[in-house]
Amino acid sequence: MTVTTRFAPSPTGRLHVGNIRTALHNYLLAAQSGGRFLLRIDDTDLERSREEHVIAIVADLDWLGLVPAATVRQSERFEMYEREFDKLRADGRVYACTETPEELDIQRKILLGRKLPPIYTRKPEGAPAPEGVAPHWRFMLDYSSPIEWDDLVRGHQKFEPALISDPVIRRADGSWLYLLPSVIDDIDLAITHVLRGEDHVTNSAVQLQMFAALGAAPPMLAHTALLVAEEGKLSKRLGSSGVDELKAAGIEPMALNSLLARLGTSQPVEVRTNLEELAEGFDLATFGRAPAHFDFGEVEEANRKLLHHASYGEIANAILAEISAEDYELLKGNISRLSELEQWLLVLDGDLPAAETADEDRAFLAQAASIAADLDWSGEPWAELAAALKATGRKGKALFLPLRRALTGRDSGPEMAPLLKRIGKDRAVARLNAASN
């Protein structure tokens, strides 16, 4: 069996990290067994679907490296849905309804008032339909036995179908709702595993009966706990979680992937530089039932770790600044975003403004400039400079911080020994002199 998964977004808005996490889970499950990951664009809602959102979804997945083996669009599959709908109708599993939303709301309130579940009440067979009213269509659930399955995350699941309303599958205007087309597609595309959020658990119960009604074996099901942020449930309106915002913040795709792959599991977050390594450790058995908390600070930390551990070859295509492998290795331990390299290159090769210097440090820095000018820079100039300056009686922070500030304009950064050698004699002496004046 070839493991085949799918990610099925609706192009009614941009993706957020909750969507991305679902796409990633499906990609990793397929990748770890050499299977296929598909993209299905759920654009049955022709009024709300937008082509620009389709383009953005594809671009976001491409940026993340989650490239599908194939892409299908539901709007191009209506004939197939019609055929399967007709079969279900002929079998008596689909029936017409004519209630208005207002009538359904009254029915619901009456049931709640009687302390009964607000389940749709089927009309008696043969009940007359009002003239001139276009019907919508419901799938008739089979009440004869419970709906059960072994969920790959939640364990054994059991639903009583009599406590679930027969779902509307088609609107009065003929347009399709989510449930039935999704099942038809999963059958046609030979989907073996459906991984999605726990908010789809009841949908899955209903859809299992649809698979059976269409004479098809269902896929394996896995429902993960939802991703939540400090503000609460994630949504497409939570702008800080959009791919564009994350990219603008300098977040690398594998930092985001590494974090999202482990959120909600018992496994620690381990930053990986490629999806193949990430797939090797992906295990649905480690997922818990509690909501997974998304914290942008954790994304930043994952980004920092990624850059600190990635080799130049692994990150070179993402670097906009012109930088050598040697310089990247020198600087990478002190950046949280690749965009910070540009400022560090100024430290190495640019003209920095003279550092602000305390009066008590001016003579010390003038002496440092004089010593630095006389050193043999083919050796270890930092060690020799520090040793010579200890004769001033300075030590520790009083010795090293004024030098670092004068030479780099910063209070922290890479080790000074390799950094000073890379800055070079002429530039270093000039900066020390400038800071002493």
What does each of the following model-derived ranges do?
Residues 1-6, 243, 276-282, 317, ...:
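Short amphipathic alpha-helical segments and their helix-coil junctions
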Residues 96, 100-223, 228-234, 242, ...:
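Active-site cores that bind ATP or allylic diphosphates and position pyrophosphate for catalysis
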Residues 214-353, 408-437:
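Catalytic adenosine-cofactor/nucleotide-binding cores of aminoacyl-tRNA synthetases and other
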Residues 312, 358-407, 411:
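C-terminal accessory/binding modules appended to enzymatic or scaffolding proteins
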